[in-house]
């Protein structure tokens, strides 16, 4: 089936209750469950089968996994036992500590947890071997349905499991997230903030502990109170350091959850503490304020109880905040709203969302370092009209997320290095060209270009109009992206790449024979020689005429014009509908062709006989066609070669078809200039003649 275009642009920020059905059957969780109950069967998910394809894509299991339902592993399975808590999360044989750290943080926010794990499921009445979970993806909530067959070895769960062997919510949640991303293997390696955002639809913020503000403790305290999800880790300098244990019992390159922050009285002083959890369920900090450290002997039983202090090897531990800053390198916070943690006020934020793509050859221009292509990136107009309350500037947050890179890992895709720049917008209401960026500096930009799924930063700018340009660092790199803009006051955003405007002059009337130029007289003689008495040429004859003339032109390198091009030319110029070209029609086309040749030569900078697809937007606009990025992408796919170049024959074909389509549309849109109405016969007739 052909690709169906869906318009990009601003979208509403969805709420979880609108979670979209994702199962290939098109049925909801409840519909499939009722169907299984009526049939007396347990659900088997054909979309994510109990087979190796759901486990790995680049390797085979080293041990013979057996897929079993919880009721085949234990006698009395429970979905959630005594509430979903962080102690229900123990890492298995999969390198997805980042996901487990995010799940542990999720359990601290019951409202967010209930959104991800719907409460309408259990192993009790109504059990049919089917469960579902809801995740946020690129500004929409998805309902992911799975069966409850889990990979086991010797009757033990291989991957994520609960400390209580008859509790299965965490293992099933991991399976649903693996399905969302294509396989269990796709979950290897990552950042906790990624899953935190998928659990909440929140906004990411990262702090370097060594460069954190003076009120860093208060920032983390406020984040936990607001229900934000927090993770932390220690940087590694090489692959060899990954999961290396420090002398203090901490693991480098390993994702931890921040589960609490508090103060304790110790020898007349208030000591700031922070509680951390290792998703392994063991291996803990062994320094000051660790589970068995002597400091706790100076703390009364009531205070110890309040802080839930126990000397258990459960992976959770307290440490002094100053030690935390000294040993950990980064803290990732997923805020459920964009309110700055440095401020006390809570605001109502306006959100707009843009879905877009970087496509090689048309919109994958790279960063400003690559001036020749940077201007071809998607451009979004941002209108800031209202100042913040009591301020002279407008606050907003920009979050740029590249889509589905984890899902595409099986095809060799990596997380790209991304960022964005913001420019003051000139009065022109159009896609800005190369010269604008040659002479204008950005007004603001992301702090860095980095290979993370999302890059987000806060800004304050005076009211006005700006152009926001999201890009990869290197040009020619392809990805889809989701751009979210949060503003305290309503900001108007518009995609500058979606406009289509055709400006074609009326075709000139042919000159009478006695007023023909010397060039036209030579054409008439050649035409008579080829066409005969009727003075009409077929596509084959037109091919001969054009190539005979163009080969004498020394200023353009080109291969012969193809027969297809000549058929398209006749389709454009043939007013009688007999499939041939009369001499007067040819004269009109020749004038047009000379203009197009000059246009091609203008953009064939190196005189190689080809032009870059990145120049296509400007070249087509000069010919009268202002096209959307989506149309440009289709043209590049159809006409460009592997080196993203077009020769003259391809360029001519493109222009002929564009003009033909435009003139047909103009002829049919008599009442409404933006729409035409066709029945199936008219539509097919139209497409066969363009």
From Swiss-Prot:
Gene Ontology cellular component list: cytoplasm
Binding site residues for Ca(2+) 2: 284, 291, 312, 314, 316
Residues holding Ca(2+) 4: 604, 606, 608, 610, 615
Origin: domain of life: Eukaryota
Residues reported in the UniProt entry to bind Ca(2+) 3: 574, 576, 578, 580, 585
Factors inducing expression: Down-regulated in gastric cancer tissue and in gastric cell lines of differentiated and poorly differentiated types.
A biological process term (GO) from this entry: proteolysis
Tissue specificity field: Expressed predominantly in stomach.
Stretch list, region Domain III: 338-521
Stretch list, region Domain IV: 522-690
First-tier enzyme category under EC: hydrolase
Residues holding Ca(2+) 1: 81, 83, 88, 167
Keyword Metal-binding found: yes
Record region (Disordered): 1-24, 498-519
Active site: 97, 254, 278
UniProtKB keywords: Calcium, Hydrolase, Metal-binding, Protease, Repeat, Thiol protease
EC number: 3.4.22.-
InterPro entries in alphabetical order: C2_III (IPR033883), Calpain_cysteine_protease (IPR022684), Calpain_domain_III (IPR022682), Calpain_III (IPR022683), Calpain_III_sf (IPR036213), EF-hand-dom_pair (IPR011992), EF_Hand_1_Ca_BS (IPR018247), EF_hand_dom (IPR002048)
Residue span(s) of domain Calpain catalytic: 42-337
Pfam families linked: Calpain_III, EF-hand_8, Peptidase_C2
Segments forming domain EF-hand: 518-552, 561-589, 591-626
Record-stated family: Belongs to the peptidase C2 family.
Function recorded in the entry: Calcium-regulated non-lysosomal thiol-protease.
Record's protein name: Calpain-9
Species of the source: Homo sapiens (Human)
Gene this protein is translated from: CAPN9
């Amino acid at each position: 089936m052909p690709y169906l275009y869906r318009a990009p642009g601003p979208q509403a920020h969805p709420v979880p209750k609108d979670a979209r059905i994702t199962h290939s059957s098109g049925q909801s969780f409840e519909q499939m469950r009722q169907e299984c109950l009526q049939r007396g069967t347990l659900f088997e998910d054909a979309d994510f089968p109990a087979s190796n394809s759901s486990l790995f894509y680049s390797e085979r299991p080293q041990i013979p996994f057996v897929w079993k339902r919880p009721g085949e592993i234990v006698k009395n399975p429970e979905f959630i036992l005594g509430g979903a808590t962080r102690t229900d999360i123990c890492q298995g044989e999969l390198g997805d500590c980042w996901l487990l750290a995010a799940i542990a943080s999720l359990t601290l926010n019951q409202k967010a947890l209930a959104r991800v794990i719907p409460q309408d499921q259990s192993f009790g009445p109504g059990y049919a071997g089917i469960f579902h979970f809801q995740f946020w993806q690129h500004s929409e909530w998805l309902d992911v349905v799975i069966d409850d067959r889990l990979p086991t070895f010797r009757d033990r769960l291989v991957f994520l499991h609960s400390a209580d062997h008859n509790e299965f919510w965490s293992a099933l949640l991991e399976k649903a997230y693996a399905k969302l991303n294509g396989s269990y293997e796709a979950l290897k390696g990552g950042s906790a903030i990624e899953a935190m955002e998928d659990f909440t639809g929140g906004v990411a913020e990262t702090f370097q502990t060594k460069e954190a503000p003076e009120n860093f403790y208060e920032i983390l305290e406020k984040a936990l109170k607001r229900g934000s999800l927090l993770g932390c880790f220690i940087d590694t300098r090489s692959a060899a350091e990954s999961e290396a244990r420090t002398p203090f019992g901490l693991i480098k390159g390993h994702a931890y959850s921040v589960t609490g922050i508090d103060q304790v009285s110790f020898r007349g002083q208030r000591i700031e503490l922070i509680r951390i959890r290792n998703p392994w369920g063991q291996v803990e900090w062994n320094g000051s304020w660790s589970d068995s450290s002597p400091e706790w002997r100076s703390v009364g039983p009531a205070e110890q109880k309040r802080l839930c202090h126990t000397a258990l090897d459960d992976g959770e531990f307290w440490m002094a905040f100053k030690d935390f800053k000294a040993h950990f390198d980064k803290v990732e916070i997923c805020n459920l709203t964009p309110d700055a943690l440095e401020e006390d006020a809570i605001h109502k934020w306006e959100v707009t969302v843009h879905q877009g793509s970087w496509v090689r050859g048309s919109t994958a221009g790279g960063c400003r370092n690559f001036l020749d292509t940077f201007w071809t990136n998607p451009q979004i107009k941002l209108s800031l009209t209202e100042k913040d309350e009591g301020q002279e500037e407008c606050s907003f947050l920009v979050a740029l997320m590249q889509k589905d890179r984890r899902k595409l890992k099986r095809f060799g895709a990596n997380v790209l290095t991304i960022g964005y720049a913001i420019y003051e917008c000139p009065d022109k209401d159009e896609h800005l060209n190369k010269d604008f960026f040659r002479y204008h500096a950005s007004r603001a930009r992301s702090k860095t270009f980095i290979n993370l799924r999302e890059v987000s930063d806060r800004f304050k700018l005076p009211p006005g109009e700006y152009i926001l340009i999201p890009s990869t660092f290197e040009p020619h790199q392809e990805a889809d992206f989701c751009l979210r803009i949060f503003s305290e006051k309503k900001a108007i955003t518009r995609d500058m790449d979606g406009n289509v405007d055709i400006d074609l002059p009326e075709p000139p009337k042919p000159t009478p024979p006695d007023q023909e130029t010397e060039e036209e007289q030579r054409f008439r003689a050649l035409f008579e020689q080829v066409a005969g008495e009727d003075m009409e040429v077929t596509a084959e004859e037109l091919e001969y005429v054009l190539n005979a003339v163009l080969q004498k032109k020394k200023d353009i390198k080109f291969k012969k014009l193809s027969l297809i091009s000549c058929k398209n030319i006749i389709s454009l110029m043939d007013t009688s509908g007999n499939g041939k070209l009369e001499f007067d029609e040819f004269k009109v086309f020749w004038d047009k062709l000379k203009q197009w040749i000059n246009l091609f030569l203008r953009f064939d900078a190196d005189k190689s006989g080809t032009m870059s697809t990145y120049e296509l937007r400007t070249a087509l606009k000069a010919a009268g066609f202002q096209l959307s990025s989506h149309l440009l992408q289709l043209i590049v796919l159809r006409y460009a070669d592997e080196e993203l170049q077009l020769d003259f024959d391809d360029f001519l074909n493109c222009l002929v078809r564009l003009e033909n389509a435009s003139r047909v549309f103009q002829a049919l849109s008599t009442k409404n200039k933006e729409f035409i109405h066709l029945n199936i016969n008219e539509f097919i007739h139209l497409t066969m003649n363009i």
